[in-house]
Curated annotation (Swiss-Prot):
Molecular-function annotations in GO: L-lactate dehydrogenase activity
Pathway assignment: Fermentation; pyruvate fermentation to lactate; (S)-lactate from pyruvate: step 1/1
Keyword Iron-sulfur among UniProt keywords: no
Entry similarity comment: Belongs to the LDH/MDH superfamily. LDH family.
Keyword Signal assigned: no
Chain residues that bind beta-D-fructose 1,6-bisphosphate: 157, 172
Function: Catalyzes the conversion of lactate to pyruvate.
Location in or out of the cell: Cytoplasm
Domain of life: Bacteria
Keywords from the named record: Allosteric enzyme, Cytoplasm, NAD, Oxidoreductase, Phosphoprotein
Name of the featured protein: L-lactate dehydrogenase
Length: 327
């Protein structure tokens, strides 16, 4: 894919709640010119393609269709949302055994089509499945990207914005680490319109320290709350994936919190994909943005990475999984 290519094509693998929400966001925002949808349920993909096409007269021209893996050969971006859903009370990491096998099959099919673009992974546990997509594809790490903590960071900014009465676009704050239970807030660099959050709160006592702790917990556990109430989360992640797609297709060099490969950017954190800010453009990850972490934050990053690394090592100790490795 090049930054000058005018016709941009997405292949979406997984037409469940998240995949459908992402497809709808692409149509609404006019991102890309072609969208092929792959799922084991062909009736579903055909129905979604037809339904989405009926919105085009109100939005932007686009070719939308039920696709086969062979259609990925000339795609610019393959988005992976396929996998078994997270059940109430189930952690994202408990999904790993089941979804790794699904991921291996899908990635193999996509690569065999001749695909040579960028993988964007959203299936959970996303950090583990981004790693496995990299291993199974043999692609450069820059062209395998996970949605990471993009949604978590958006939730964090929105929660802070609501608490202090400021537009979320003027609140700059990141969640880093695993997209899941071991994620953490980078309080040391959170700011409101360039003013450090702690300094802002000295002059505007909208929330105390315990309130900040409670706010983070609500952000971390937001998915569980939503799943318990409606069965799944999909609108937020659908829009987050559309935002990442736009940054790639428009060669924005935007800084977004994504699941990216760790090669020692942070002491003690290596050979995992994990959430941190990164510059993203037409060719994938330009480079990670290594925010200086406080000692406490670095310890949380290391602990989060270790948890992911232990799960990855256990999974790839399975000969059937290891047999598919290309990287």
């Amino acid at each position: 894919m090049t930054a000058t290519k005018q016709h941009k094509k997405v292949i979406l693998v997984g037409d469940g709640a998240v995949g459908s929400a992402y497809a709808y966001a692409l149509v609404n925002q006019g991102i890309g010119q072609e969208l092929g949808i792959i799922d084991i349920n062909k009736d579903r993909t055909q129905g979604d393609a037809e339904d989405l096409s009926h919105a085009l007269a109100f939005t932007f021209p686009k070719k939308i269709y039920s696709a086969e893996y062979s259609d990925a050969h000339d795609a610019d971006l393959v988005v992976l949302t396929a996998g078994l859903p997270q059940k109430p009370g189930e952690t994202r990491l408990e999904l790993v055994e089941k979804n790794l096998r699904i991921n291996q099959q899908i990635v193999t099919e996509i690569v065999n089509s001749g695909f040579n673009g960028i993988f964007l992974v959203a299936a959970n546990p996303v950090d583990v499945l981004t790693y496995s997509t990299w291993k199974f594809s043999g692609f450069p790490k820059e062209r395998v990207i996970g949605s990471g903590t993009s949604l978590d960071s958006a939730r964090f900014r929105q929660a802070l914005a609501e608490k202090i009465g400021i537009d979320a676009r003027s609140v700059h704050a990141y969640i880093m680490g695993e997209h899941g239970d071991s994620e953490f807030a980078v309080w040391s660099h959170a700011n409101v319109a360039g003013v450090k959050l702690y300094d802002w709160l000295q002059d505007n006592r909208d929330i105390d320290e315990q309130g900040l702790v409670d706010l983070f917990v609500s952000v971390r556990d937001a998915a569980y709350s939503i799943i318990n109430k409606k069965g799944a989360t999909y609108y937020g992640i659908g829009v987050a994936l559309a935002r990442i797609t736009k940054a790639i297709f428009d060669d924005e060099n935007a800084v977004l919190p994504l699941s990216v490969y760790q090669a020692g950017q942070y002491e003690g954190v290596e050979d995992v994909f994990i959430g941190q800010p990164a510059i993203i453009g037409a060719h994938g990850i330009v480079r990670p943005v290594n925010i200086p972490l406080s000692d406490a934050e670095l310890q949380k990053m290391q602990a989060s990475a270790k948890q992911l690394k232990d799960i990855i090592d256990d999974a790839f100790a399975n000969p059937e999984i290891a047999a598919g490795v290309k990287n």
